[in-house]
Amino acid sequence: PLPAHHIRVIAVQNGGGFGGKSDPFNHEICAAKMSMLTGRPVKIALTREEVFFCHRGRHPVLMRSKMGVSKTGRITALDFESYLDGGAYGSYGTASTFYTGALQTVTYAVENYHFRGARFFTCKAPCGPKRGHGTVQPRFAIEVQLDKIACDLGLDPAQMSLDKLAPRASATANHTRIRP
């Protein structure tokens, strides 16, 4: 084994992780082993395309959303379910499942909120964290639902969204603080 005092990690300024740097991947293990075998430093440099090939993809998500809205478009209740297809391995599935629910009340003022979620192992390619992991799929679903509700109420969807934004320095239904 390589003694710990012989290991030097140089972390360069390369931006945030956003999920893509959360899991250890095969090429990182190979680089460590190559360094042990050669006794020399090993550098990994991936192109943007290679990053997409070797990192995990987004979770397919089955969602059910039931929303209570007043005639003026005020969101009185949101009942949201999300079921994530995690593929064959665990990865950051718990966090992705949590985010599908925890962040749905941040954008708009929601008076009452209920969330249920689960992540399932399947015989598919593994899924994991990606930029905005766990939030992109449900955000799309909620926005489409709000647009349909606005049309049913005879309201402009964009204006209704702007009018219903969560106020600054407020707390969401699940006690997340909105920055002032």
Regions found by a protein language model. Name each.
Residues 1-180:
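Structural alpha/beta core scaffold segments of enzyme domains
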